[in-house]
Structure formats: C-alpha cells, structure tokens
Amino acid sequence: MDADGLPIVGSGVDLTKVPAIQQRRIVAFLNQFIVHTVRFLNRFSTVCEEKLSTVSLRIQQIETTLSILEAKLASIPGLEEVTVDGVRAPAETNGPAADTSRATAPPAEASQQTQAAPQEPKTEAPAENIMTVAKDPRYARYLKMVQVGVPVMAIKNKMMMEGLDPNLLDTPDAAVPDASKKRLEEQDDDSSGSESSFSD
C-alpha cells in the first residue's frame, strides 16, 4: 500500500470475495448476439438470392433470343452452303501492307483511265442542244415554285408522284437524263403528223 492506501501491484481485490455475474445477463447477451447474427445472415442470403434470380432471368432471356435467332436462321433456305470468303489475315508489319497497296494502286488507276477514255467523246456534244433542267417545261414550273417559297419536301413528293426525279431540283443547270427520249418521241410525233397530212 502507498500513502494514499492504493495497492502498488495488482488490483488489490480479493477475487474469491467478488460475486459472480448473473446468469440471466449472460443469457440475454448471448441471445442478442445470436439474433443479430441470424438477422445479418438472413438479409445477406435474401440479397444474394435476389441477385441470383435476376441473373438467371437474364440468362433465360438470352437463351430464348438465341433459340429464336437459330430458328430464323434455320428457316432461311440454302444458308448451309454459304461460306465466308475474303477474310484477310492482319498484316504483321506496316511494310508489306504499304507494298501491297502500292502494287494494287496502278490497276485501279488504269481502270479509271480506261473508263474515262470512252466517256470523252460523249462530252464533245454541242452544249446548245443539251436540254437542262431549267429549260425543261416539266421541271421549270417546280423551280418556280421553289423560288416562290413552296416547301421543297412537298415539291419533291409531288415530283415523285408524277414520275420525275426530285434530285434534279438541286442542280438546275444539269442535263435532263430523259431529254433524248423526249426528242425522239417528238420526232416520231412530227413524222406521224406529216404522214397523216400527206395521206389527206
């Protein structure tokens, strides 16, 4: 004991004289711990079950879509004989790819030159005889409607109903594609008219 009456070493309490803890309190503590643990496990299991059910539902949906796709593919006739062609392996380096592009470029240029060569005589036709969209009476009235302020979409729909090309409104200086046919029809009409006049 020190001067204040406190023990120097140990608690200074005789444990043999200390009363025991009540059994009811021990049972209450154990019951509370068990209840808390069981509630936590129940909640954890319910959350896991919900997630597993959603995953299983998604898997079922995927299986149904796959079965529908398989049925649609099986309904297409002659699909078993189709083979995938033209699949190229990726080039290992950039060098060979550049060489192949250079090697394939000259034939393309040559083909373009050969295609451009026969088209040159066609463009040598006199520009005065070419019927443009603005000069054609069928398209001229639609161009006037555009200038007045009529909606373009309505005009194009009307042109499509009448069998005309609505894209020609954007290029009024372009040549009418069926102008030659129209000229031939006019010539035929003139010739038939002259024959009828001779017959009279």
Swiss-Prot record:
Protein keywords: Coiled coil
GO cellular component: WASH complex
InterPro entries attached to this UniProt entry: WASHC3
Any GO BP annotation: exocytosis
Domain of life where this protein originates: Eukaryota
Region (Disordered): 87-130, 165-200
Protein's UniProt keywords contain Cytoplasm: no
Coiled-coil region(s): 56-76
UniProt key word Coiled coil: yes
Subunit structure: Component of the WASH complex.
Family, similarity comment: Belongs to the CCDC53 family.
Name recorded for this polypeptide: WASH complex subunit 3
Organism: Danio rerio
Lineage: Eukaryota, Metazoa, Chordata, Craniata, Vertebrata
